[in-house]
Amino acid sequence: EWALLNFFVNEHLGDGYELILPPHMLNYECGYVAGQFPKFVEEDYWIANPTSADRKFMLPTAETALVNLHRDEVLTLDELPRKYIAYTPCYRREAGSYRAEERGMIRGHQFNKVEMVQYTTPEGSDAAFAEMVGKAERLVQELGLHYRLSKLAAGDCSFSMARTYDIEVWIPSMGIYKEVSSASNARDYQARRGNMKYRGEDGKLHFVNTLNASGLATSRVMPAIVEQYQNADGSITVPEVLRPYMGIDVIR
């Protein structure tokens, strides 16, 4: 897993992203700006009572912290786009996920993930989204995993997101594809909640666009590697891109 995380982070840094190590405990306002509250307030772990004045919740995804970095700020055109990544554990209650296919590493209350977030102008938003989807796809391709790219229907997208694509890897033992990355464009939804603007060439203030994508979640990538790379004798061939980090070619 550490080899995967190092591979992901190094790939993103090489593409011009800035690494952030955000806090794991956030206040209610962070969840509100990200578009997770009040609708999903019951899905997170709370340090204090959700209705108390000093309420804090555990980070469900690094996106929640990263989209609050420029809250109540005015950026310049020269500062856009801003590209951030963060590696964090993610903490989720996952209430109601009791199916057999959701056991073990596939869906846990704590898992590790590298997250990408961009702040862009509205004009650069679509290009940024295509870039982020392409980056997540490239990571899966470089690992040599069988996968598919799915565009979510409007009814399946979060209410705060204008567009979402999922990247899913094949899990042979389950006979299904499971999501390892979700890329979304919030347009100016989060920016309006967080009062995040930039000054345009016309001298006026405009809301930025925010985008996020997993790059990637390790808890589902690892089972996919184990199963797709397993040999007849039970050994596991290490994907070529991970060998410099692990120092071995085969796990026996």
Predicted regions and their residues:
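TRNA-recognition modules of translation machinery and tRNA-sensing kinases, especially anticodon-binding
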Residues: 1-252
